[in-house]
Amino acid sequence: MRPDHRMGPPHDEEPHMPETIDAVPEIDDLRREIDELDATIIAAIQRRTEVSKTIGKARMASGGTRLVHSREMKVIERYIDALGPEGKDLAMLLLRLGRGRLGY
């Protein structure tokens, strides 16, 4: 066995690349779509956070609590129903963005 085989193909050989040249433009298009979706999602999260903070301030100004546990549980349930178990983590993050961490 030649020593250079331990480190990969000999230096005069190109590593084998699968034929994916035709897929590159499609991948680029899909990545652009993901970037656009991310921008839309970020804008929606920012707006959701603003609305949630406004609701919290209004509730506290009228003598209520900053949050309503039953409402938060419905939000978490909605995300779990739509996205599966991972939806819980996303819902909790969105709730925290809108009201801040509990106990802090």
UniProtKB/Swiss-Prot annotation:
Q: Which Pfam families match?
A: CM_2 (PF01817)
How is this chain's activity regulated?
A: The formation of the complex with AroG activates the chorismate mutase activity.
The reaction(s) this protein catalyses: chorismate = prephenate
- Alphabetical GO biological process terms: amino acid biosynthetic process; aromatic amino acid family biosynthetic process, prephenate pathway; chorismate metabolic process; salicylic acid biosynthetic process
Question: What is the first-listed, main subcellular location in coarse terms?
Answer: cytoplasm
In this chain the Chorismate mutase domain maps to 23-104
Q: How does it assemble?
A: Homodimer. Probably interacts with AroG (MSMEG_4244).
Can you name this protein?
Intracellular chorismate mutase
Question: Which organism was this protein described from?
Answer: Mycolicibacterium smegmatis (strain ATCC 700084 / mc(2)155) (Mycobacterium smegmatis)
